[in-house]
Every structure is written in C-alpha cells, then in structure tokens.
C-alpha cells in the first residue's frame, strides 16, 4: 500500500517520486514506468474521436488514484484519490488516512483545521469540504438524512454542519479556490530537469513556402550558485532551411537523440526513384522531444532539409514520445475571393477545415503503416499523408493532425538572423 504526503495546491507523493500539478504527461508516465513493480494496473483513458473534449486520464486502479491532464496543454490539472481504502495519506508528516485511522470529518478538522462551511450536492448526495487547493467529499449515511441538507431547508443553515462520523469518499488536489474552475498551472521549475520546452513554435514562410521556425523557449534559470534564485527563463530562437548542424546546435542546444535514417520509404513516390544514385551515407534527425520537433539534416551537406512538428495526440503510434508542439502555420489561400489572404493552422486544427481553406490535394493520400517490427500490427491503425504547399500533413482517422513535415530546398548561404540586422 502506498504511503503518500498530501501538499494542497501542489502535489501527492513520497520521498522517491511526486505527482506535481502542472507536470507534463510524459513525466508522470516516466514515474509510473520506473516504479512499475509497485504501481501496477495503470489505465490510460481518452476520447478516441474527440480527444480535446475530455481530460486525458491516468487511472491507477490498484491504488485508487486518478490523474487528470488538461486535454490541450497535457499538464496535470487534478489529482483525485477516489478509493481511500487503497492508500495511506498524511499531511505535514501526520497520517489522517490509514488502516488504523479513518478519514472522518473529525479527523479532517483535526489535521487541516477550520475552513468554510461544507457544500451539499444533492445530485451526488455528497458534502464537499473545500480548502484552498484541496477538497474532501463526504458520503451521507442514508437517504433519510439528505432532505435537511438541501439549501432551502432551515434557510440553508443546516448545511453548515456535516454529520458526525461521516467519512471521506474522495479527495482532490488542484490549483486555486474552485475545483470546477481549476486549470492546469504553468509547469513548476522542479519539472524542467535541465530540459528546454517550447511555449510556441511559429512557422516562418516566404513567397515560395515555409522557410524556418521561430521558437519561444522556456527553461529554468538559476542565480549565481543559489538554487533558491531559480526562475523561469523565456527566450526566442530561429532555425531555417539550409542552416548547418552547428547553427542548430548553437540555437537549440544538443538534441535528446540523433537518429540515422536507414532508408527513405517515401522515395518511391518521387519522380524516377530507380534512377537515384544510392547514397553511401544516411540523412540524420535531431530529435528534440521536449520541443515536439525533429530536424532532418542532409547527409552530404549537413544542412537542414526538413522539420517535423508533432501534436502528440493520444491514439497515435508516437504518443507520449514527444511533448506537444504548439505550432502556428500561416497558410496561403489561393481562392479567387481570398486576395492573397493567409489563414493560421494550429496544433488543434482539423484536416477538414484545412482542406476547405487550401482546396483538396490533387493526389490521393499516402497511407502510413507504423509498427515496431514487420510482424507486429499497429493497434491505433493507419494514418494518411497529404502534401500541400511544401508541407506533408499526417492525419489521424479522427480527422486530427498527428504531425506536419515542412520541407524546402536548402538555401545556399546562412540565413541572416534578426540579431545581425542593422
């Protein structure tokens, strides 16, 4: 049985690990994977057809804990303990829930002190006792007690008193004063772990198509040798097609991984693929997992030739490998009445809406089958790749975009950076 410390408006954990509000989904999954012998039977719950309409949930069934992640930013929004009999809980080092201590209203008062009157929910038949960043739900013993706690009974004053001996049915940890209005907080500094994250990624374009990326980056910076002076650092960097490997390293730092392509599976769709001379060396990717970006370099020139932006939707083969890339892509509208107008494609745009703006592709999509080995099948099914305006949109079966690949001819010279402008 897990023995965990409750920190209102912040976290639930122990000396080995901690689920912290604002934590990225990937970090929570990494904790579960590392401690898989202790924390077992974890379920991932999401809406397959409408992944943005419901929270993404990690359900720790063995331990009675549910982690709710915001569907958009994929950061931890609410920590719910839904079965208190499966876990030990303490506050400031003192247990208020264990096999020997029942979490009664008297025990909660003793451990957490006074707060506002409890609020009765007649639909759930539960009392909610709210502290800042922490709520307890109490179950009424019988239906006969319910009417006197209705708001219109005794001018609402009866709801000031939760019945003696009532025990906690659920506990919630969240940010702010209201569970209903809570949002996932910004990522805590403790979750950066030396990584750089992208707050937003803007696709730059010229008259012919995409030309590069402008990234707004977040990092945890420290004062001179004092950890307590740690604070969020925000800065911008730009990388372009034709930039050298050294240019990218100086802008974004070292990648999490370098991946060398063994073969080009899309080469068969290029004109006269059989006439292409086999290369003696392979193109390679810089994988920036916390940015949600891959950068492909030409094996001969070591210049940028492609960018890949990942949306990290559940139900995709690469889910949870990349942090979600919050991109914005300007699209050139070619309709007669558009008059050179541009529209913005984002991480949350659906393929149908993009097709309405750009027109349907001339060619049929390329069907992409992913699997870990030739003998394995992908349980999430195939995706479809459409090419438009020097971009390849990988589309899932629910009409959401899984990734966008930007490509273009390498530029002959290094791109003039903003900092170098007169």
Swiss-Prot record:
The keyword Cytoplasm applies. InterPro entries: PHAF1, PHAF1/BROMI. The keyword Cytoplasm applies. It is found in: Cytoplasm; Preautophagosomal structure. It comes from Mus musculus (Mouse). Belongs to the PHAF1 family. Pfam families: PHAF1. Interacts with BCAS3; the interaction is requrired for the association with the phagophore. The gene is Phaf1. Plays a regulatory role in autophagic activity. In complex with BCAS3, associates with the autophagosome formation site during both non-selective and selective autophagy. Keywords: Cytoplasm. It comes from the Eukaryota. This is Phagosome assembly factor 1. PANTHER family: PHAGOSOME ASSEMBLY FACTOR 1, UPF0183 PROTEIN. GO terms for cellular component: phagophore assembly site.
